[in-house]
Curated annotation (Swiss-Prot):
Keywords: Cell cycle, Cell division, Septation
Record's function text: Could be involved in septation.
Pfam families (UniProt xref): SpoVG
UniProt-listed GO biological process terms: division septum assembly; sporulation resulting in formation of a cellular spore
Identification of the protein by name: Putative septation protein SpoVG
NCBIfam families reported for this sequence: PRK13259.1 (NF009749)
HAMAP family, per database record: SpoVG
Family the entry assigns: Belongs to the SpoVG family.
Length: 103
């Protein structure tokens, strides 16, 4: 499975969250609301989550192995970096990221 499209929406609020992202997998399945977060060790990608009635945040969607997590994170962070370099106000679309697939 490959990340075939990434859309970045910059967040204009103060705080650690820098952007929201949507990814398309194999041109067939979209996952919205991934978050680009500034952590203590740099940027990372948080999966979309929902608060339970108990107040605990639970991922709505997430990769089930390290390879897919790396593909998602690398694709989103690359799109975010390009978006920041270009300083564009509109959404950035990165298509055909299949070239980053090691297989």
């Amino acid at each position: 499975m490959n990340v075939t499209d990434v859309k970045i929406r910059r967040v204009v609020a103060e705080g650690r969250m820098k952007a929201l992202a949507s990814i398309t997998l194999d041109h067939e399945f979209v996952v919205h609301d991934l978050r680009v977060i500034e952590g203590n060790s740099g940027l990372f990608v948080a999966m979309p989550s929902k608060r339970t009635q108990e107040g605990i945040f639970r991922d709505v969607a997430h990769p089930i192995n390290a390879l897919m997590r790396k593909k998602v994170e690398d694709s989103v962070l690359e799109a975010y970096a390009i978006r920041e370099e270009n300083g564009e106000a509109s959404e950035l679309e990165l298509a055909a990221l299949e070239a980053t697939d090691p297989s």
